[in-house]
Amino acid sequence: MAHDMLFRGVAPALVTPFTSDDDIDEAAFRRLIDAQIEGGVSALVVLGTTGENPTITEDERRRIVDAALDAADGRVPVIVGTGTNNTDESVAFSKAAVDAGADGLLVVGPYYNKPSQAGFAAHVETIAAAAEAPIILYNVPGRTSFNIAPETALHLAEEVPHVAGIKEASGDIEQIDDLLAHRPDGFGVYSGDDEMTLPLLAMGGDGAVSVISNALPGPFCELVAAGLDDDLATARDRHAELLPAMRACFLETNPVPIKDVCAALGWMEPHVRLPLTPMDERSPVRQRVLSAFDDLIDVTVA
């Protein structure tokens, strides 16, 4: 089944800024969105892993989606993370996002309850039938302990009209190769791991859902644009420049490092919600994170 690709290029997996007293910092969120669009991104992803989805209340979800749609103002598609390990809840979140005006949905493989491949397929089919909006599957087995098998993703792409792509964060090149070799027309295959973006593009992929773009939208968009234009020499150069910072984003649990970088830039507080905790200001890990970005942008290393 052919699809209309939701985007091609970079979609930042946006952090959710919080104030020091744990409220949503809508002003910082809107500034972040403007910076991303000015940097050249092709879409926005809100309420994903990097957006601390598990600790966001239902009311806050509405506020975040409304703020993202208002700030984007039609300039790029807004994709909302609505997948959970509860199908009914995922349906409710998906319908609410579509009703608010979301352009697409990000549906993660169910975590903790570890369904069969058939169970996951039924989960997605149920969401798609209820929400009737483009769906990007999200495969991140390191977080969920569940791997979306290529044959399952391809079955859904062929049989379910709204399944329009996959964010692949398994790190499995063979799996990515299978998806790219057998996908239907218009089915997007995106890197969900910044460090894997260059190889995915070289294999014919369509872009990335990115963590590092929160702080470096322009340089990361240059990498992806070069790869999509088959200018692999330029893409390799950008990859080499960004690689230390890409790796630094995962020296502690995402989004802790990237939020600290954004805070060092003066864009937001470094606050994350429990059970995540911010890095200690004097920790060696924090120094390594900020130092990795210091060659690329002017961050304050305390």
Curated annotation (Swiss-Prot):
Q: How does this protein assemble?
A: Homotetramer; dimer of dimers.
* Pathway as given in its UniProt record: Amino-acid biosynthesis; L-lysine biosynthesis via DAP pathway; (S)-tetrahydrodipicolinate from L-aspartate: step 3/4
Reaction catalysed by this chain?
A: L-aspartate 4-semialdehyde + pyruvate = (2S,4S)-4-hydroxy-2,3,4,5-tetrahydrodipicolinate + H2O + H(+)
The primary gene name is dapA
According to UniProt, the name of this protein is 4-hydroxy-tetrahydrodipicolinate synthase
Q: What is known about what this protein does?
A: Catalyzes the condensation of (S)-aspartate-beta-semialdehyde [(S)-ASA] and pyruvate to 4-hydroxy-tetrahydrodipicolinate (HTPA).
Supply the source organism for this entry.
Answer: Salinibacter ruber (strain DSM 13855 / M31)
Q: Does the keyword Magnesium apply?
A: no
This protein's GO cellular component annotations are:
cytosol
Q: Which family does it belong to?
A: Belongs to the DapA family.
Task: Please give the InterPro entries that the UniProt record associates with this protein.
Answer: Aldolase_TIM, DapA, DapA-like, Schiff_base-form_aldolases_AS, Schiff_base-form_aldolases_CS
